[in-house]
Amino acid sequence: MAASFSVPSMIMEEEGRFEAEVAEVQTWWSSERFKLTRRPYTARDVVALRGHLKQGYASNEMAKKLWRTLKSHQANGTASRTFGALDPVQVTMMAKHLDTIYVSGWQCSSTHTSTNEPGPDLADYPYDTVPNKVEHLFFAQQYHDRKQREARMSMSREERAKTPFVDYLKPIIADGDTGFGGTTATVKLCKLFVERGAAGVHIEDQSSVTKKCGHMAGKVLVAVSEHINRLVAARLQFDVMGTETVLVARTDAVAATLIQSNIDSRDHQFILGVTNPSLRGKSLSSLLAEGMAVGNNGPALQAIEDQWLSSARLMTFSDAVVEALKRMNLSENEKSRRVNEWLNHARYENCLSNEQGRELAAKLGVTDLFWDWDLPRTREGFYRFQGSVTAAVVRGWAFAQIADLIWMETASPDLNECTQFAEGVKSKTPEVMLAYNLSPSFNWDASGMTDQQMMEFIPRIARLGYCWQFITLAGFHADALVVDTFAKDYARRGMLAYVERIQREERSNGVDTLAHQKWSGANYYDRYLKTVQGGISSTAAMGKGVTEEQFKETWTRPGAAGMGEGTSLVVAKSRM
């Protein structure tokens, strides 16, 4: 007879703690924050992936703040507007006027990679590049928050009442590109973002091996299901870490021309096939391989591809069926009836698979249709894809089950596209929040909008549900504009260029970098020195002799440029 097994109390305690934590996670998930989120895993899965040492993350407090900010804008029909910040100077200036901060992968790729090797936005930099920039800015936010608190607590109540308080702790949303590889790469990337201070992360549905800036050509999508896996990986990692990090799903389906796979039926209606029967058995890839074998390259291969594509008569399966129905030897009324029946069943929201489409077409009399989506595949094996707002809507429906915001990348600031996408996505997921890239890649002056319409663009699409809007590269362009124009003028006019363009403008606009020693925190660290040394320090940085005292005075400036001899100009005291 087998001996009975007595479960040690330690094992029971371990299980008890595990079950209690599972219950905590289930309660957390049932909160208002996650009422729209659907997870394909359980709370037990999450807790099993956690360690015993419970950790808290400052980014989680920022994530909660971001969520409150965005939901408030959504409720009010307004938008959080922001742009890509390059450095601590920009992030502290932005804090006075904007309620969120963006960290752009493009800007990091061109100005601040982990290897210091700049380049275009191809997501080929080390995957800690953007998290490192997030940490750079998040540390700066926290530092300037501490510095401000020390300064304010050194003031009298009357002085504090007259001194505006700046909330430097604005939530950061960061560019996660495509997740940088497979599931484990996405998991580790998201872990870095949480640890480095990101309140939100966006991940796009391009192929990670061919990723391009959203406004470059040659974009290749992954299947809907593959991008859902990326989003699930991100959400799972946030859950394991116990954070409410805001997840933004971006789709490049509007302008994409290729897709990696036809495995997901939701993509089938947008994949293009050959309808020219004379190309049966003559795939483009084999034709190009033959051309290379005989020594063709470059322009010659491009000519072969162009000629083949021009004769292929590429179209979606649905368009091919409609064309076949219209060619049938039937009365016009019967043709119209069958076309309408096809279009009714093949509506984009039904997401018919190709197999289902062929069955339906056969019932309508289209039994010998030649349509082949394998023949036009590229040399890399990609399928041809007909990008559109409709394709983006279909993806938006799928991604909204996991993500908190949906972002459709566009080629121009098209109000009709914005409306179509918003109405399409919200027809099935009415409470989802939307994001919009107010891209500097758009030639806004060529958009056909008046200045008034440009000014109204943000609030107008905010009313459609785009509650987070951002100029990805405004920090980069602002930096370039200021430095280029100043350098040009400085080369010509010397110090007068600096005084007129920089110093006086800082003074008149109340920009706190005018007193750059104070901005950098010299007073703050003097407080450390004095605290350590009993309240006094002979080596304080802001003591007697610091040149920044000049900016606290009111003075007269004789011989001002453009004024008569003997005149002077009174310059107002700087705003410190």
From Swiss-Prot:
List the Pfam families hit by this protein, alphabetically.
Answer: ICL
Residue positions binding substrate: S104, G105, W106, G214, H215, R250, N437, L438, S439, P440, S441, T472
- Write down the chemical reaction(s) this protein catalyses: D-threo-isocitrate = glyoxylate + succinate
GO CC annotation terms, alphabetical: glyoxysome
Span(s) of short sequence motif Microbody targeting signal: 574-576
UniProt xrefs under InterPro entries? ICL/PEPM, Isocitrate_lyase, Isocitrate_lyase_ph_CS, Pyrv/PenolPyrv_kinase-like_dom, Pyrv_kinase-like_dom_sf
Q: Tell me, what is one Gene Ontology molecular-function annotation carried by this entry?
A: metal ion binding
Family membership: Belongs to the isocitrate lyase/PEP mutase superfamily. Isocitrate lyase family.
Chain's role: Involved in storage lipid mobilization during the growth of higher plant seedling.
Assembly and partners are described as: Homotetramer.
What name does UniProt use for this protein?
Isocitrate lyase
